Amino acid sequence: MKTKGFERKRRIIVGVSGASGAIYAYRLIQVLADSGIEVHFVASKAGLEVLEYECGLTMVQLTQMVHKIYDVNRIDSAIASGSFPCESMVIVPCSMKTLGSLANGIAGNLLTRAADVTLKEGRKLVL
C-alpha cells in the first residue's frame, strides 16, 4: 500500500469467535504473517478457548505470530476507530452469535465493534 511517496505496511484485522473451525484462523494468521502482512488480532473468550482446544495454540504462541493482540472487552482500542488504517477484516470462524450481532448492528464488544467500523468505512469484511 503506497501513500504520499512512502510504503505503508499492509494491515489486516483477524477476529475469532467461538465457532468450530479454529484451524482456519490459525492457518490464515500463518499465511498473512509469512506474507509480511501486519496482523491485528481480537478474539472472543470462546474463540480463544476453541483456538487452544482445536489447535493447541497458546497465548504465548499467538503473541509470537501476530503484531498485536487486543482485549475483546476494550472497546476503546485502536481497531475500534475508523481512523485505524487497515485494508480489511476477517472473522474466522464466525459464530452465529457474532453473525447475528453484526446483522443487527449490535457492537457489544471489540470484535463486533471493529467489524462494524470495517463496514462503516467501506472496507472488506470476510466472515
Predicted segments with their positions:
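A cross-family phosphate/adenosyl-ligand binding-site feature
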Residues: 2-126
